[in-house]
Amino acid sequence: MDSQDIRYRGGDDRDAATTAMAETERKSADDNKGKRDQKRAMAKRGLKSLTVAVAAPVLVTLFATYFLGTSDGYGNRAKSSSWIPPLWLLHTTCLASSGLMGLAAWLVWVDGGFHKKPNALYLYLAQFLLCLVWDPVTFRVGSGVAGLAVWLGQSAALFGCYKAFNEISPVAGNLVKPCLAWAAFVAAVNVKLAVA
């Protein structure tokens, strides 16, 4: 009879342990579902902010290019040299550069970099505004020298962005590198346009 009591008590403990484990697993599954829902909601917010961060600079650049557009003088000056790209390629690459800078700025923002280093935000805004001003000054007004001055300021702000972004997020810093290369090429185009 003692052995029956032991088995019975063991079975009762086993049932209680099984019930407790099942309850723990259920709570864990509920917690995981809640965490999964939280992560999904956070990912949706992140995707929305990424879309805005990339699309806004591209759309503003497109707007400035279209409405503040260019005059016919670029075509005449560009024909004087074979290495100067056509205007549509110049504008398309400026749009891509704006998108890359928007993505880099978003990566810095996600890491809280604009709070840690507010100068990074000021440099980003300065390079973006100077990029917007460059097209009308160089092409609409037709001043190659003033355009070169604006572009050199934009390039300096871009280099400052590279240094600041690279300290916060190396990936963001690497995204600025193609923009720096493009800025150097456009500076060379500006010199040619200023001389021509």
UniProtKB/Swiss-Prot annotation:
Please state what is observed when this gene is inactivated.
Answer: No visible phenotype under normal growth conditions.
GO BP terms? porphyrin-containing compound metabolic process; response to abscisic acid; response to osmotic stress; response to salt stress
User: Any idea where this protein resides?
Assistant: Endoplasmic reticulum membrane; Golgi apparatus membrane; Plastid, Chloroplast membrane
Primary location: endoplasmic reticulum
The source's domain of life comes to: Eukaryota
Membrane-traversing stretches: 47-69, 88-108, 120-139, 142-165, 174-196
Write out the GO MF terms: heme binding
| Span list, region Disordered | 1-40
Query: What's its job?
Result: Stress-induced membrane protein that can bind heme and may play a role in the transport of tetrapyrrole intermediates during salt stress and contribute to the detoxification of highly reactive porphyrins in the cytoplasm.
Q: Which GO terms describe its cellular component?
A: chloroplast membrane; endoplasmic reticulum; endoplasmic reticulum membrane; Golgi apparatus; Golgi membrane; Golgi stack; membrane
Q: InterPro entries this protein is in?
A: TspO/MBR-related_sf, TspO_MBR
Basic and acidic residues: which segments have biased composition?
Answer: 1-16, 23-35
Q: How does it sit in the membrane?
A: Multi-pass membrane protein
Q: In which tissues is it expressed?
A: Specifically expressed in seeds (at protein level).
Q: Any idea which UniProt keywords this protein has?
A: Chloroplast, Endoplasmic reticulum, Golgi apparatus, Membrane, Plastid, Stress response, Transmembrane, Transmembrane helix, Transport
- Other facts noted in the record for this chain: Plants overexpressing TSPO show increased sensitivity to ABA and salt stress. Cultured cells overexpressing TSPO have reduced greening and chlorophyll a content under light-growing conditions.
**Per the entry, what induces it?**
By abscisic acid (ABA) and osmotic and salt stresses (at protein level). Induced by methyl viologen.
Protein name (record): Translocator protein homolog
Q: Give the gene that encodes this protein.
A: TSPO
Similarity annotation: Belongs to the TspO/BZRP family.
Q: Does the keyword Phosphoprotein apply?
A: no
